[in-house]
Protein backbone atom coordinates (compact mmCIF):
# COMPACT_ATOMS: atom_id res chain seq x y z
CA UNK A 1 0.00 0.00 0.00
CA UNK A 2 2.90 2.34 0.73
CA UNK A 3 4.18 1.92 -2.82
CA UNK A 4 0.77 2.94 -4.19
CA UNK A 5 0.78 6.08 -2.06
CA UNK A 6 4.32 6.92 -3.20
CA UNK A 7 3.42 6.44 -6.86
CA UNK A 8 0.23 8.43 -6.34
CA UNK A 9 2.34 11.24 -4.93
CA UNK A 10 4.63 11.09 -7.98
CA UNK A 11 1.70 11.24 -10.42
CA UNK A 12 0.02 14.08 -8.53
CA UNK A 13 3.16 16.20 -8.21
CA UNK A 14 3.87 15.65 -11.92
CA UNK A 15 0.34 16.73 -12.83
CA UNK A 16 0.75 19.76 -10.56
CA UNK A 17 3.93 20.83 -12.37
CA UNK A 18 2.29 20.52 -15.78
CA UNK A 19 -0.88 22.35 -14.74
CA UNK A 20 1.05 25.17 -13.09
CA UNK A 21 3.39 25.56 -16.06
CA UNK A 22 0.50 25.75 -18.51
CA UNK A 23 -1.37 28.23 -16.29
CA UNK A 24 1.66 30.48 -15.94
CA UNK A 25 2.19 30.51 -19.71
CA UNK A 26 -1.41 31.65 -20.18
CA UNK A 27 -1.65 34.18 -17.35
CA UNK A 28 0.08 37.58 -17.12
CA UNK A 29 3.47 37.79 -15.45
CA UNK A 30 3.17 37.23 -11.71
CA UNK A 31 5.79 39.93 -11.02
CA UNK A 32 3.01 42.40 -11.82
CA UNK A 33 0.95 41.14 -8.90
CA UNK A 34 -2.05 43.53 -9.12
CA UNK A 35 -2.50 42.77 -12.83
CA UNK A 36 -1.98 39.08 -12.22
CA UNK A 37 -4.63 38.94 -9.49
CA UNK A 38 -7.15 40.98 -11.47
CA UNK A 39 -6.63 38.75 -14.52
CA UNK A 40 -7.59 35.58 -12.66
CA UNK A 41 -11.29 36.25 -13.21
CA UNK A 42 -10.70 37.07 -16.90
CA UNK A 43 -9.00 33.76 -17.71
CA UNK A 44 -11.18 30.98 -16.26
CA UNK A 45 -9.34 28.01 -17.80
CA UNK A 46 -5.79 29.04 -16.78
CA UNK A 47 -7.10 30.04 -13.36
CA UNK A 48 -8.72 26.62 -12.96
CA UNK A 49 -5.43 24.98 -14.01
CA UNK A 50 -3.58 27.10 -11.44
CA UNK A 51 -5.87 26.05 -8.60
CA UNK A 52 -6.01 22.42 -9.74
CA UNK A 53 -2.21 22.40 -9.76
CA UNK A 54 -2.14 23.71 -6.20
CA UNK A 55 -4.71 21.11 -5.16
CA UNK A 56 -2.66 18.37 -6.84
CA UNK A 57 0.36 19.53 -4.82
CA UNK A 58 -1.62 19.31 -1.58
CA UNK A 59 -2.94 15.84 -2.43
CA UNK A 60 0.56 14.78 -3.44
CA UNK A 61 1.85 15.81 -0.03
CA UNK A 62 -0.91 13.81 1.67
CA UNK A 63 -0.04 10.73 -0.39
CA UNK A 64 3.64 11.27 0.38
CA UNK A 65 3.01 11.40 4.12
CA UNK A 66 1.00 8.18 3.91
CA UNK A 67 3.80 6.58 1.88
CA UNK A 68 6.42 7.62 4.43
CA UNK A 69 4.35 6.04 7.18
CA UNK A 70 4.45 2.69 5.35
CA UNK A 71 7.77 2.56 3.49
CA UNK A 72 11.40 2.90 4.49
CA UNK A 73 12.72 6.28 3.36
CA UNK A 74 15.49 4.56 1.41
CA UNK A 75 12.82 2.89 -0.72
CA UNK A 76 10.33 5.75 -0.98
CA UNK A 77 12.59 8.72 -1.70
CA UNK A 78 14.17 7.45 -4.94
CA UNK A 79 10.68 7.05 -6.40
CA UNK A 80 10.36 10.83 -6.47
CA UNK A 81 12.85 10.89 -9.33
CA UNK A 82 10.12 9.35 -11.49
CA UNK A 83 8.40 12.74 -11.48
CA UNK A 84 11.33 14.21 -13.44
CA UNK A 85 10.75 11.62 -16.15
CA UNK A 86 6.97 11.99 -16.18
CA UNK A 87 7.08 15.77 -16.36
CA UNK A 88 9.72 15.78 -19.11
CA UNK A 89 7.88 13.21 -21.24
CA UNK A 90 4.49 14.86 -20.75
CA UNK A 91 5.90 18.33 -21.47
CA UNK A 92 7.27 17.02 -24.77
CA UNK A 93 3.98 15.39 -25.66
CA UNK A 94 1.42 17.97 -24.49
CA UNK A 95 0.76 20.97 -26.73
CA UNK A 96 1.33 24.45 -25.38
CA UNK A 97 4.22 23.72 -23.03
CA UNK A 98 6.85 24.60 -25.65
CA UNK A 99 9.33 21.87 -24.70
CA UNK A 100 11.92 20.79 -27.24
CA UNK A 101 13.43 17.32 -27.45
CA UNK A 102 17.19 17.24 -26.86
CA UNK A 103 19.41 14.17 -26.88
CA UNK A 104 21.20 15.37 -23.76
CA UNK A 105 17.91 15.42 -21.86
CA UNK A 106 17.19 11.89 -23.04
CA UNK A 107 20.61 10.82 -21.77
CA UNK A 108 19.85 12.50 -18.43
CA UNK A 109 16.53 10.67 -18.25
CA UNK A 110 18.39 7.42 -18.88
CA UNK A 111 20.77 8.20 -16.04
CA UNK A 112 17.82 8.86 -13.72
CA UNK A 113 16.30 5.49 -14.61
CA UNK A 114 19.67 3.77 -14.16
CA UNK A 115 20.15 5.36 -10.76
CA UNK A 116 16.65 4.44 -9.70
CA UNK A 117 17.23 0.82 -10.70
CA UNK A 118 20.55 0.71 -8.86
CA UNK A 119 19.02 2.07 -5.67
CA UNK A 120 15.77 0.10 -5.71
CA UNK A 121 16.89 -3.22 -7.22
CA UNK A 122 16.57 -5.95 -4.59
CA UNK A 123 19.89 -7.13 -3.24
CA UNK A 124 20.97 -10.65 -4.12
CA UNK A 125 20.53 -13.06 -1.24
CA UNK A 126 23.80 -14.34 0.16
CA UNK A 127 24.16 -17.81 1.60
From Swiss-Prot:
Q: What is the lineage of its organism?
A: Bacteria, Pseudomonadati, Pseudomonadota, Gammaproteobacteria, Enterobacterales
This protein's pathway reads: Bacterial outer membrane biogenesis; lipopolysaccharide biosynthesis
The record's disulfide annotation reads: none
Q: Which organism is it from?
A: Erwinia tasmaniensis (strain DSM 17950 / CFBP 7177 / CIP 109463 / NCPPB 4357 / Et1/99)
Task: Give GO terms: molecular function aspect only.
Answer: carbohydrate derivative transmembrane transporter activity
Q: Which GO terms describe its cellular component?
A: plasma membrane
- Which membrane topology describes this protein? Multi-pass membrane protein
Entry's family note? Belongs to the ArnF family.
Name the gene that codes for it: arnF
Q: Its function?
A: Translocates 4-amino-4-deoxy-L-arabinose-phosphoundecaprenol (alpha-L-Ara4N-phosphoundecaprenol) from the cytoplasmic to the periplasmic side of the inner membrane.
The residues that cross the membrane are 3-23, 48-68, 77-97, 103-123
Task: Give me the Periplasmic side stretches, as residue ranges.
Answer: 24-47, 98-102
In Swiss-Prot or TrEMBL terms, this protein is called: Probable 4-amino-4-deoxy-L-arabinose-phosphoundecaprenol flippase subunit ArnF
